[in-house]
């Protein structure tokens, strides 16, 4: 009886650990320009200023049936900030904002993924300007399936908000310009 119980417990623990290992690994499709990291911030409270980071890389693990096995990792070259205005971009790269000479990369590493209806709540650590803080992203699965080139793809859009001061960006842009909205749209190619 004890032997059967031990065998059952061993089998259950192996299945549980195998479940977390079943999440498929995906790499962001940057070559086809099917991945974007964008942001927007209010300009003095009068309008939105939009920008993006053009150089980044990332991976995610996705198991639709076991979201707790899902993971997201993103690395951003902060020097690639682009708001369609060269002087503003230069200012954003300076020590007053992103301080790219001292902090050339920003990273996001998920710590937990939970399914919430049709959406996913992704919690993780964002390191920006040398400061690491927890951030929550609300993500949606846009679609998944085979592509014409023999690969399998999955696409997500995630959104979240960060406060500039939380990341030691203390330049005062006025009370309406303290929060930055993040929009991340990625299409990942499943790794074989």
Swiss-Prot record:
The keyword Signal applies. It is found in: Periplasm. InterPro entries: Lipid/polyisoprenoid-bd_YceI (IPR007372), TTHA0802/YceI-like_sf (IPR036761), UPF0312/YceI (IPR023480). Its main location: periplasm. It comes from Pectobacterium atrosepticum (strain SCRI 1043 / ATCC BAA-672). SUPFAM superfamilies: YceI-like. GO terms for cellular component: periplasmic space. The keyword Cytoplasm does not apply. This is UPF0312 protein ECA1782. Pfam families: YceI (PF04264).
């Amino acid at each position: 009886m004890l032997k059967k119980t031990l065998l059952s417990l061993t089998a259950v623990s192996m299945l549980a650990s195998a479940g977390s290992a079943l999440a498929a690994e995906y790499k962001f499709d940057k070559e086809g320009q099917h991945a974007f990291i964008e942001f927007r911030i209010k300009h003095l409270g009068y309008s939105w200023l939009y920008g993006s980071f053009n150089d980044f890389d990332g991976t995610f693990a996705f198991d639709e049936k076991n979201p707790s096995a899902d993971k997201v990792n993103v690395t951003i070259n902060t020097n690639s900030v682009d708001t369609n205005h060269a002087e503003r971009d230069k200012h954003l790269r300076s020590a007053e904002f992103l301080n790219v000479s001292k902090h050339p990369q920003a990273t996001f590493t998920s710590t937990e993924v939970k399914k919430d209806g049709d959406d996913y709540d992704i919690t993780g650590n964002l390191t920006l300007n040398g400061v690491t803080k927890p951030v929550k992203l609300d993500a949606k699965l846009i679609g998944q399936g085979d592509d014409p080139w023999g690969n399998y793809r999955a696409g997500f859009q995630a959104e979240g908000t960060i406060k500039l001061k939380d990341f030691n960006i203390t330049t005062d842009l006025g009370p309406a310009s303290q929060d930055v909205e993040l929009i991340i749209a990625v299409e990942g190619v499943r790794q074989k």
